[in-house]
């Protein structure tokens, strides 16, 4: 659940409680790519345009009649969930039928007239307090409505080109790797972005691999991922990739020679054994790899493999992280770092022998790929995972070093470091001349130390220490974005240094520390805007730092540059427009891939940076297919604004249905994530489940980034520490009250939903609210007690349970009386969720059982992990959400409380069965 600030959650399930992707070993494959108010006439048009929608939601759409939104209990109607369909009453009298048919024709005539007037009348614009994005679609009233299949598939997904910048072997800037594009001359190529000319030939690129397959000893190798060596002479190839956890995987590794276009096993003596991790030396002369949790070294000058460690195994990891470090610290599968000169390798030794195990059961599949023993075919496969829950023993991590020339392992003691059971190592950064910076925190992640180690002298010291808890009551997020700045006296840099993100005047800002042991930095950025996962690029020749900020408003992203001395702050993107950009820079930062991500149709182009004397610009993607679709469909409009709650100005996004009419009454769905440092209110282009709810179902969707979320200041962020859910739930409820008071909102039909942390927040909100504002909630894969979640994440925001038992008690979902006061809520969870264990949902169900609470529905997905996608589950989970929401706003769930038999139906059934019964008992 590690939340990376600034990571937009395009897909609710994709980055639930966990961080976004981080760059991994320069792999070209490692890019991660996230109505009740509608008139009858509109509903008819929707039926014509979207027959597939009917299949998903059933024949009956949301009612339009605000005064009679809930149908009488004794009237038969057709909805998908047959368990909740009351039986019909007596047959109608003929005169009643005639009267009803007459009324129906008169009503249709009236609706038709109203429909014509609605089309041709002049529409008033609804004013927004801050900024309103006009509906980017131009389909208008007659435009198609998106279907659930549309948003679950790739119909509305922007195309992204997977460009991987590559440092030239001779210092060239602007080189990039490309794979298998249209009309390409080879599977893997390196190109000069400007000249598109190859220094070896006139073909415009250097072809590293002509095909994505090759043969070794009669075995056909199919590339899964590829990593060229820094000198571009050899390609490290992964085949037969098999996923392990979210970021880790195993496979077979090969060395592919560019000149001969032939391959060989990375380890010729163990060709068929699966490897967990492999990475190039900076000099291209060796590959270090981990297999069965032990480390090995293969030098290209020999086919022999050197064993670095031999005692690795089930409880001892070398060079790769265990589950919790993979998930919550590195967001990746590597804990190995080469020194720049290739003479040393730093790596983590992780001992998790004391970490308790959690069993994951697989009832349908067998992820191990192994056949069960005879007679055990009908038993679930069980995978034990070392998972440290809050307060439980953590894995013990040590930083060790391998001297490549001497072939020996050593460690360096540093005085006053955290003890083994109170230490997290969150970043390792090589400097020059055998120096390495190590970022560590205590177990509760609120005290930061930076240690400088010299592997040549095998000495080390603490050069910087910050008590974040004392500073603002907050914590340290584990990031790996610190940049080493080498000394260059000719360019005004007499000493080595590094650029880091620090807390300055209540915001995250960039700071330059030089020399390495100087704890007092030069602050490079100031003001109300916060930097995001920065620095993004460094131009050492020109002395410039490039970075991304949450612009004038927190929902924006813009790119800036500043000099190493903090002067000449300049925007790279057009800051006069409220936009959302992302960027990646070439190795020398002379060029950049600029990604415009919204609010309009995304595009990509390669540009020269402003300091580059040779201007260059090339558009590589315009997403014309999305522009065409927008002309055909009617999508929601978006309103961005701030709402003040308890003195905090909170970003709010309101999605309004097409042809929004402020004189009507709309149901409202709140969608949230809300995890610490996260952001959901942003200006990215996205057509997602929320778009479907607003555009097709015709409901208003509101998203609030409450206290605890990112980019609205440290004061707002840190206040949630130790009491997760308290302030966040209050913010959702208070904003919901403001929406309930709006003239266009039906306050009796309000729901809230979220996934993962958002699932926790859904339950916490309806628990705190007790049915006073929200009537419905939908929680997917929720945490229900932070004692059940992993230690590194939970303790960062809640302290340990031993330190803060009352905080854990109050944050747990436990007030069953309050939950019973809601009309109904839905909980869904995957049984094989390795992140948020189904234990969370099951223990909540037990509390509800003990309290005799039954106003909820549960859907369990066998063998699905946190993403819920096993055996068609991905589609089912969203179909279930949509159907359940429609039934809720149709008043369907009001009929499930204290159900009684239909008198006339029971009489008929009893008579048919020849039974006698005292019907007075029914009254």
From Swiss-Prot:
Segments on the Cytoplasmic face: 1-99
UniProt GO MF annotations: aminopeptidase activity; dipeptidyl-peptidase activity; serine-type peptidase activity
Regions of compositional bias (Basic and acidic residues) in chain numbering: 1-16
UniProt-annotated stretches for the region Disordered: 1-21
Reaction(s) catalysed (UniProt annotation): Release of an N-terminal dipeptide, Xaa-Yaa-|-Zaa-, from a polypeptide, preferentially when Yaa is Pro, provided Zaa is neither Pro nor hydroxyproline
Enzyme Commission number, as recorded: 3.4.14.5
Subcellular location(s) of the protein: Vacuole membrane
Keywords carried by this UniProt record: Aminopeptidase, Glycoprotein, Hydrolase, Membrane, Protease, Serine protease, Signal-anchor, Transmembrane, Transmembrane helix, Vacuole
GO cellular component assignments: plasma membrane; vacuolar membrane
Vacuolar side: 121-923
Source superkingdom: Eukaryota
GO biological process, one term: proteolysis
The protein's role, per its UniProt record: Type IV dipeptidyl-peptidase which removes N-terminal dipeptides sequentially from polypeptides having unsubstituted N-termini provided that the penultimate residue is proline.
Protein name stated in the entry: Probable dipeptidyl-aminopeptidase B
GN (gene name): DAPB
């Amino acid at each position: 659940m590690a939340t990376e600030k600034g990571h937009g959650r395009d897909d609710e399930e994709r980055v639930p409680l966990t961080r976004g992707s981080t760059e991994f070993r320069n792999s070209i494959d490692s890019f991660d790519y996230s109505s009740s108010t509608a008139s009858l006439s509109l509903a008819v048009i929707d039926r014509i345009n979207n027959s597939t929608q009917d299949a998903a939601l059933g024949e009956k759409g949301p009612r339009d009649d605000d005064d009679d939104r809930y149908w009488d209990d004794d009237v038969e109607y057709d909805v998908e969930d047959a368990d909740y369909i009351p039986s019909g009453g007596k047959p109608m009298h003929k005169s009643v039928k005639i009267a009803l048919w007459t009324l129906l024709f008169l009503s249709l005539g009236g609706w038709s007239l109203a429909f014509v007037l609605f089309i041709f009348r002049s529409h008033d614009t609804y004013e927004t307090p801050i900024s309103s994005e006009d509906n980017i679609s131009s389909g208008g009233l007659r435009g198609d409505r998106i279907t659930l299949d549309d948003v679950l598939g790739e119909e509305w997904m922007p195309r992204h080109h997977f460009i991987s910048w590559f440092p030239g072997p001779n210092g060239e800037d602007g080189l990039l790797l490309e794979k298998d594009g249209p009309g390409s001359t080879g599977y893997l190529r390196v190109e000069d972005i400007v000249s598109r000319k190859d220094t070896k030939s006139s073909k415009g690129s250097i072809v590293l691999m002509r095909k994505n397959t090759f043969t070794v000893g009669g075995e056909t190798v199919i590339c899964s991922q590829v990593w060229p060596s820094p000198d571009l002479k050899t390609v490290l190839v992964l085949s037969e990739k098999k996923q392990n956890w979210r970021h880790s995987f195993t496979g077979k590794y090969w060395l592919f020679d560019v000149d001969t276009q032939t391959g060989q096993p990375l380890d010729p003596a163990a060709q068929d054994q699966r490897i967990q991790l492999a990475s190039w030396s900076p000099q291209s002369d060796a590959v270090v790899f981990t297999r069965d949790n032990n480390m090995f070294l293969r030098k290209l000058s020999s086919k022999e493999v050197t064993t670095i460690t031999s005692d690795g195994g089930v409880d001892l990891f070398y060079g790769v992280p265990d589950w919790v470090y993979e998930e919550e610290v590195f967001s990746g599968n590597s804990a190995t770092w080469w020194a720049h000169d290739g003479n040393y390798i730093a790596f983590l030794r992780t001992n998790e022998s004391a970490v308790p195990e959690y069993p994951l059961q697989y009832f349908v599949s067998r992820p191990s790929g192994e056949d069960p023993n005879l007679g055990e075919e009908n038993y679930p496969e069980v995978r034990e995972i070392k998972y440290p829950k809050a307060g439980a023993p953590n894995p013990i991590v040590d930083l060790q070093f391998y001297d490549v020339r001497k072939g020996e392992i050593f460690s360096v003691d540093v005085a006053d470091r955290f003890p083994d059971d109170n230490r997290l190592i969150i970043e390792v950064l090589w400097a020059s001349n055998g120096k390495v910076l190590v970022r560590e925190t205590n177990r509760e992640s609120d005290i930061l130390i930076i240690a400088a180690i010299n592997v040549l002298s095998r000495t080390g010291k603490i050069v910087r220490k910050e008590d974040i808890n004392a500073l603002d009551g907050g914590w340290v997020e584990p990031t790996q974005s610190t940049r080493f700045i080498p000394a260059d006296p000719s360019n005004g840099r007499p000493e080595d240094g590094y650029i880091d993100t620090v807390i300055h005047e209540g915001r995250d800002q960039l700071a330059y520390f030089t020399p390495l042991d100087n704890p007092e930095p030069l602050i490079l950025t100031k003001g109300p805007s916060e930097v995001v996962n920065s620095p993004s690029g460094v131009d050492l020749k020109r002395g410039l730092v490039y970075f991304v900020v949450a612009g004038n408003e927190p929902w924006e992203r813009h790119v800036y540059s500043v000099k190493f001395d903090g002067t000449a702050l300049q925007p790279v993107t057009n800051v006069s427009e409220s936009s959302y950009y992302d960027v990646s820079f070439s190795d020398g930062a002379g060029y950049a891939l600029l990604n415009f991500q919204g609010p309009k149709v995304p595009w990509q182009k390669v540009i020269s940076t402003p300091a580059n004397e040779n201007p260059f610009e090339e558009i590589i993607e315009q997403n014309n297919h999305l522009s065409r679709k927008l002309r055909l469909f009617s999508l929601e409009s978006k309103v961005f604004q701030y709402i003040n709650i308890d003195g905090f100005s909170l970003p709010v996004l309101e999605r309004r249905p097409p042809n929004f009419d402020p004189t009507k009454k709309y149901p409202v769905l709140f969608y949230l994530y809300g995890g610490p440092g996260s952001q959901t209110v942003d200006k990215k282009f996205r057509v997602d489940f929320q778009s479907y709810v607003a555009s097709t179902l015709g409901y208003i969707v509101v998203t609030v980034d409450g206290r605890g979320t990112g980019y609205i200041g440290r004061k707002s962020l840190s206040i949630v520490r130790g009491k997760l859910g308290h302030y966040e739930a209050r913010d959702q409820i208070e904003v919901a009250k403001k929406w309930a008071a709006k003239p266009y909102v039906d306050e009796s039909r309000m729901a809230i939903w979220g996934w993962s942390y958002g699932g926790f927040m859904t339950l916490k909100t309806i628990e705190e609210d007790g049915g006073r504002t929200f009537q419905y909630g939908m929680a997917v894969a929720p945490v229900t007690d932070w004692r059940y979640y992993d230690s590194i994440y939970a303790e960062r925001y809640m302290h340990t349970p031993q330190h803060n038992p009352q905080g854990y008690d109050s944050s747990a979902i436990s007030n069953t009386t309050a939950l019973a006061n809601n009309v109904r809520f839905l909980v869904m969870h995957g049984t094989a969720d390795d992140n948020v264990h189904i234990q969370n949902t099951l223990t909540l169900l037990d509390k509800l059982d003990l309290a005799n609470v039954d106003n909820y529905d549960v859907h369990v997905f066998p063998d699905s992990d946190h993403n819920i996608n096993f055996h068609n589950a991905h589609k089912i989970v969203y179909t279930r959400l949509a159907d359940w929401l429609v039934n809720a706003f149709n008043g369907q769930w009001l009929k499930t409380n204290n159900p009684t038999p239909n008198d006339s139906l029971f009489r008929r059934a009893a008579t048919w069965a020849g039974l006698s019964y005292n019907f007075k008992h029914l009254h």
